[in-house]
Amino acid sequence: MRIVYFDCFAGIAGDMTVAALIELGVPIDYLREELAKLPLPLSAYSISVEQVQRKGIAATRFHVRAEEHQPHRHYTDIAAMIEQSTLSDRVKEMAQRVFFRLAEAEARVHGVEIGHVHFHEVGGVDSIVDIVGAAICLDYLGIGELHVSPLPLGSGFVETAHGRLPVPAPATAELLRGIPVHGDVGPGERVTPTGAAIVAALADSFGRAPAMRVVAVGCGAGSKDFDDMPNVVRLVMGEKTAILLKDEIYVIETHIDDMNPEILGFLMERLLACGALDVAFSPLQMKKNRPGSKLTILSSFDKLDELARLVLTESTAIGVRYYPVARMILSRAMEERDTSLGRVKVKVVSDEAQLLRIVPEFEECRRLAREKGLPLMEVYRIIERETAGQ
């Protein structure tokens, strides 16, 4: 599978994203031909690329030259424009997801329904070209997964159609909900609404780069030239070929010895519903010879704070420990398979090269055991036997 990692050390914008994707191998003429499938007048815009330097780093700059006076388009106008185009279904779906996230953010900022959202800067032809262009490029390159580094917040103020606003702009701040960010960069707008919307809508994960065999690297330049670092977004494209996938997760732990054990089960349910990768209780003999439980939670980076806070509000714990751990995992996916008992969900486990096993889902087996009046173990055996060759 082909994947791409967005290294946003200096930030991200829509035009920077398209520029970096072009460096990864998208022909500019192909991009022009595909963008022409949008129901926009040919005189409304033109695109071009140039090679630039940012703090000694060679990068591509993507330009969209549009008519000076742009109408303030509503979200529904842009959604209809994309749907009416002759672009591929995958490109349409990606572009629609990005604009929907933008509309959600604008609706929250201005306190209106999504259908009433009208875009200013992001409704211009240049932003439409940036977002649809990014979708076209991702489709051309055959990207199956998109992973993104934590994003820099930036600081200061930015001039917008609504006046002078703090960085990140309100819509950008809304788009960053649930995304890991940091403040380890200088002043200025580092993440634009279009850049934030692209990764918020399309990213499969945020954090460290996944294991891959690197195929190409592309650098997309922004319009500004910062004093502290090269203003580029770096995209690393590769093939996900590792037999054992490697990533980093976090372990959250705490010891509990003064809580009604009936509540522990409820706490586990809440943690799993909140996005914990796994939850376990282990018996302990604690100080003063009291029996207790060790709570262990496996968490992704973006769920770390939320899960820790949930432990502190739903239990008697007054503190938690957490630390990163590396892990190696097999690829897994939920699929539906046909059996004599009906269509069932199973977990398909592979090493990217071959299928290793198919594991029936417990909830599916329990449901079928009740519906068919069969022993649970018999349901397991039937599903395992009938899906083995599929």
UniProtKB/Swiss-Prot annotation:
The species this protein belongs to is: Geotalea uraniireducens (strain Rf4) (Geobacter uraniireducens)
**Which taxonomic lineage does the organism of this UniProt entry have?**
Bacteria, Pseudomonadati, Thermodesulfobacteriota, Desulfuromonadia, Geobacterales
Q: Which Gene3D superfamilies match?
A: mk0293 like domain (3.10.20.300), Transcriptional regulatory protein pf0864 domain like (3.30.70.1380)
Record family assignment: Belongs to the LarC family.
Which terms does the record give in the GO molecular function aspect? lyase activity; nickel cation binding
Q: Tell me the protein's name.
A: Putative nickel insertion protein
Which UniProt keywords are given for this protein, alphabetically ordered? Nickel
Q: Which InterPro entries match?
A: Ni_insertion (IPR002822)
One Pfam family hit: Ni_insertion
Q: Does the keyword Secreted apply?
A: no
